[in-house]
Amino acid sequence: MLIQFSKMHGLGNDFVVVDGVTQKVFFNAETLKRLGDRHFGIGFDQLLLVEPPYDPDLDFHYRIFNADGSEVQQCGNGARCFARFVRLKGLTNKDRIAVSTVSGRIVLQLEDNDQVTVNMGVPEFEPAKIPFRALKAEKLYLLRVAEQTVMCGVVSMGNPHCVIEVPSVKDAPVETLGPKLESFDRFPERINVGFMEVVSASEINLRVYERGAGETLACGTGACAAVVVGIQQEKLKGRVKVNLPGGSLYISWNGPGSPVYMTGPAEHVFDGQIEL
């Protein structure tokens, strides 16, 4: 079966985006691994699938798959690319696009200059809903991982995140501590790990080790999680600039019960077709 796809990226976090509205597609884990291979396939951090809406009040359903074949609940950089894709392909003429994901609903707003603002929803701190094994919600947790003590904030942005403050992201133990925390037994569904350097109350540097993908050039939900944790711990406030290896995002959050807003770019690279 021949399928059409687009290659896109948000700050270097790269995606294969597939229209599942006008073409019939089905991906199993084996196919996803083959397509995700950067030497023998197309290569991507995630594959994004556009599906018809499950609810008449929504415009589309948004599914996200990692290159290891696993399906994930949320991807902020992918959401921005999703919004640009459905407009570029004529699947909608709206600037405000409401979609469902595995973890809930999000709203995408197309701005000028290829920027997209995403209402990422309300962050979840309740351990059982993250999921995270803890007696109660705390602003800061102490974890004993691989014979070292780690202080971190834990939150779900539709997917689970652990955020650690570091003196410098340049020297952060992303490749060593990242995978150990990702599979730590107190995170039953594994976790994304953010290493945050606070520059000022309105700016941070961030590196993210993503669950199922390793370190990526940018992680939208990771940026949201880091800002939420920083605001909760009174280290950040207002609109925060998040500097990632691939570029910068702007994150806003007004506190508990409020949604997180993320603004950043979405770039279309090329279109192609491949035999499944």
Swiss-Prot record:
InterPro entries membership: DAP_epimerase_AS, DAP_epimerase_DapF
Principal EC category: isomerase
Compartments, record wording: Cytoplasm
Catalytic residues (positions): C75, C219
Cited HAMAP family: DAP_epimerase
Keywords recorded for this protein, A-Z: Amino-acid biosynthesis, Cytoplasm, Isomerase, Lysine biosynthesis
Binding site for substrate: N13, Q46, N66, G76, N77, N159, N192, E210, R211, G220, T221
A GO biological-process term: lysine biosynthetic process via diaminopimelate
Signal sequence segment: none
Name this protein carries in UniProt: Diaminopimelate epimerase
Keyword presence, RNA-binding: no
Family: Belongs to the diaminopimelate epimerase family.
Lineage: Bacteria, Pseudomonadati, Pseudomonadota, Gammaproteobacteria, Aeromonadales
Organism from which the protein derives: Tolumonas auensis (strain DSM 9187 / NBRC 110442 / TA 4)
NCBIfam families for the chain: DapF
EC number: 5.1.1.7
